[in-house]
Amino acid sequence: FANRWGGVFTTMQNYLYFYIPLLTMSLVSKELSSGSIRLLYSSPITNTQIIVGKFFSMMIYGLIMIGILFLITLCSWAVVKDFELSMVLTGLLGLYLLICAYAAIGIFMSSLTSYQIVAAIGTFAVLMVLSMIGGWWQEYDFIRDVTYWLSMPGRSGKFIAGLICSEDVLYFVIVVCLFLSLTIIRLNSVRQKIRFVITLGRNIGVIFLACFLGYLSALPQMKLYHDATSTKINTLTPNSQDIVAKLDGGMTITTYINALDPGSSWFAAPYFLKPDMERFEQYLRFKPDMKLKYVY
């Protein structure tokens, strides 16, 4: 299930990337192109109810998809000795959260145009940006934290590996709320003829709030973890935890770099600070005040 080179969940992630945008491209754009959106506007329901209703339909559809995988899980649990049920269930949770995030993004892009193909292409473009943004502007401290948090790759991978982190859970929740809010703002601006400047200000405010909450959730001191594997493969051994617990005060890991070596010096550039921190994530879990320092 969790094999990164062809496991069921890993393959499912790749399919979702292409399937969900095609599924959501008509949720709002078809209403706009056919004119049926006017019927919704004239009915006694708010734009929030319209969008939340469409999102709930995608959530239910996602549950059906996950339910099929759950049946496969039950069959495997019944015939495989020492089956890692809790780990596989954690992977299912990660896939479901990924479906919800993709659906929210797709609904937003569908609300921007009456052309379904354009909505699908726009969704692919947003997903591509979220896949690449983790490597942008890594030279600046605060921006590095925000852009790296916005990056989507690997989020559901941690669930598939059996590790639940509060940062990843909040990431999906914040992304869903962000794009649903942007969709509601978009429909309100059309329905109520709101000025462009006001709509732009609301969009910027929502995006800023989402980035700020994401920045807080990514702080090591704010993270909570649960290792669902039976062998606790994602957690330090008890002996290692005892050693880390005995370290009083802060801890700084200093890396000395030979800047004249073109083959390895670039690994210590600010661009690689976040990947470096991920290597020590198991230690950061028990020593959140640990810092990295580079000497050139």
What are these regions (language model features)?
Residues 7-30:
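Long, hydrophobic alpha-helical segments
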Residues 219-296:
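Juxtamembrane extramembrane loops of integral membrane proteins
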Residues 2-13, 52-116:
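Secretory targeting signals
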Residues 1-6, 112, 119-191:
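Terminal transmembrane helical anchor/hairpin motif
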Residues 23-41, 55:
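Transmembrane helix boundary and interhelical loop/hinge segments in multi-pass membrane proteins
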Residues 16-22, 99-104, 169-184:
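Hydrophobic cores of alpha-helical transmembrane segments in multi-pass inner/ER membrane proteins
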